Every structure is written in C-alpha cells, then in structure tokens.
Amino acid sequence: MKNQICLVLAFSASLFLSHQSVAKEKDSAFVPFYFSTETLGSTIGLAGVAKGVGQPQAALFGMGLYSEKDSYVGFLSAFNYALSSNLLFSTQMYQARFNDNPYYLGDQGSNGSSTEDKTITNGDEENYKLEFKFLLPWGNVCEHGLLGAFQPIRDVSFASPVESGVSSIIFTPFYSSRELDIYNDKKEEATGFSLTFDWDNRDSVRNTTRGSHTSFDLTTGAESLQSEDLWLKWEFQNSQYYSLGPLGDWFDQQVLAFDFYTADTPTWNQCDGTVCSRPPEQEQVRLGGLYRLRGYTAGRYHGRSAIHYSAEYRVLPDWQPLDDIPLINYYDLPWWQWVAFVEVGRVADNYDLKTLHEDMKWNVGGAVRFQVEGIVVRAEMAKGADEGTFRVMINQPF
C-alpha cells in the first residue's frame, strides 16, 4: 500500500462530504490510527470531521500523519459553504514529505514500463485548491433550491439535466508542486484552474441503484502565472447504474454499475525547442490508485491520454449480522454491500482510439462496503497482471 493513499483518502472524504445531507449522524468524529507499510514504515495519525460548522450543509475535514521515516502528511479542507442561494465554496490544502519513496518518473510510467523500474527518492509535495460551485437552476435545484443538492434520495425519472438531478458548473483555481531530491531540489510546479460541468443524476450518492453521473472537465495551467507555456487537459467521465432487483432470500438488492473515463492533453506536442506545453507529472493524465486500475499503485501509469472502463456487480445480502456484534453495533450500520469488479485501461502519448485499446492493463477484484454513520467505507482487494493491492478507504469509487 503506497503512502499516497493517505492523500487520496482525504480527497475521497471531500468528494463524499460534498454530497452530505443535513442528517441524524454524529456532528463530529475524531479517529486516531496506526498502520505500517514498506514505504512509510510504522505510522501514526489523526483524522477528524465536523459537520454543520457555521452552516448546516457545511463540513470541515482534517488529517495528519507521521512515520518512523520522518515522512508526514497534512490535509485540511472546508466544504459546501454557501456564498449565495446557488453558489457553494470549498477549499483543500495539502502538504507532505515522503522519504525513500518510490516514484514512476518519465518513461517509468508509460504503458510498456515494468513495475520493477522505479525511482526511490525523497519528495516534498503541495496541493492547494479553491472551488466555486455554481448550482444551475435545473432539476432538483429548481424544485427544492439549495437543499436539493444535498438530498440523500432523489427522483431520477428523467434523462435530461434540465428536468432531473443536480447540475453545476465548477471553477477551481489550483497550485501544485513536487520537489524530488533526485532533481537537485528543482520544483515541478503547476498554477492554473479547471472548469467543470457536472450532472449528478444518481438516486443516491451512498448506495446508487439507478441513474447516471456525467462530468466534463477542462484544466489549463503553466509553471507560473507569468509563463507562456500553457498546457490544456480535458477529461470526460460517465457512470451508469442499473437495478436488477432482489434475488430470492439471498440478496435484497442487485446493481450493475459501469464507468467510462477518457482524457487527453491536446497541447502535448506543442514544443518550442526542448520546452513543450505539458503538465508536470503530478498533473498528467494518470491511471492507478483508488478510482481507476485499482490493482495498481496511485499514478502508476501517466502520460498524454488515457481510456478506462470499470464494471461492478453490487449486492446487498439479506444476511446482516453487524447489528449483533458488540462494539460494532454502537455505530449506525444500516447496510453492507458485496462487490465484484473488473477494470481495463491504458495511457498513451497520442489520443488514438486504436492505440488506446491495444495492450490494455487490467485488474479484477472484490470488495466489502459498509455505510458507517453516513459514510461509505470500503475494503477491497484487486489483482492485475503484475501488481496487486489491498486498500481500506471511504466513498464509492464511482
């Protein structure tokens, strides 16, 4: 398990909290934790969340950890502060130091690279984001106003964003940097912004049975605000969910979930001498981690473009023993879910559909997911051709 998982866990928390309802769950929680991995060694940390801070739909989240290798991660965030009846503000701040950490640099992250071909070095990482989310007056927001964006159960009878779901335009200025010792402390920096159209037409964020979720994202940036070497990246993602109903006395619910993702960097080959309009590696199109090619390390593959497919079979078993287990039954655990999934995808240095569908990487896996105090916790194992992972995290992958 790579140390970057801790960062992505925090981002997963932000994705989930952005859809929280004003609910009956606990207003705050703080959890100390300990784990040990090959890259970090023995590690201790503390994570906490507070809901309804200042406004009923708002939330604060923070996490910090420190390892025996003197590596550390710090993450702070605030979500869903209403600046007006249709404008929400969120922010995320992340800093980390990783010592003796594996990185897949340059061609080490290409589709044809070997898992054993990696660079071990020390690295400092930073990432800061401001998010301004404008809720379009369509669908659920038109009918229910601001609270329509936070309803836990929605009617998704229509296949148009004007009539159904929650549609938004999101403007996100950002700054990120990575400084590796192997590069003699030269920083790889990116300053820019992304513009996203998002249509969330799922009947439930936590346990989706019907509907869809679609987003299109444009990101542009450069090394600094004064730089003329602007790069441009676009990403498209679409998820679809189909209910199969119950299965006798075995399963109360069956769902087929599919996800499609593709991305490209059109400025990749716009070069002036040795300088090309390309994002630094931490901002490139990436596969591997918590959401795509989950059998591989976070950011294992990166480059100009990518395509990725996921399919999941999700069931809620009729057998529910969790309420009878001491200590565990202290928490609100309304359901648990069994999942089988398969994924294929690849990166490439050109956006060519034929190339992107050749020599694709794959993994298969299984997961058990729980809703705990309103938060979806997932434990999953995935295995690819040359790598495998086991992770415990929060939030549905899509």
Q: For the regions a protein language model found, what residue spans apply to each?
A:
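Transmembrane beta-strands of outer-membrane beta-barrel proteins
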Residues: F30, A58-G62, L87-M93, S167-F171, ...
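Outer-membrane beta-barrel translocator/channel fold
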Residues: G64-P137, V141, W250-L290, R300, ...
